[in-house]
């Protein structure tokens, strides 16, 4: 079983955790329907970049 030789400092702990921050997902608003959607994804109505791409 692995056992640490020395206790990691607060600085090293912080350096390790520096990449753990959560980021918010970028959301766009469609030109035609005004609906919010994820970037590079179609809206729930089937619009992408102002054009109807899926007919429901």
From Swiss-Prot:
Q: Name one GO molecular function term.
A: structural constituent of ribosome
Q: Which Pfam families match?
A: Ribosomal_L32p
Q: Where is this region: Disordered?
A: 1-29
What keywords were assigned to this record? Answer: Ribonucleoprotein, Ribosomal protein
Q: Which SUPFAM superfamilies match?
A: Zn-binding ribosomal proteins (SSF57829)
- Family matches, as InterPro entries: Ribosomal_bL32 (IPR002677), Ribosomal_bL32_bact (IPR044957), Ribosomal_zn-bd (IPR011332)
Single GO cellular component term:
large ribosomal subunit
The Gene Ontology biological process annotation of the record reads: translation
Give the domain of life: Bacteria
Q: Which HAMAP family match?
A: Ribosomal_bL32
Q: Which PANTHER family match?
A: 50S RIBOSOMAL PROTEIN L32, LARGE RIBOSOMAL SUBUNIT PROTEIN BL32
Question: Can you tell me which family this protein belongs to?
Answer: Belongs to the bacterial ribosomal protein bL32 family.
What is the protein name stated in its UniProt record?
Answer: Large ribosomal subunit protein bL32
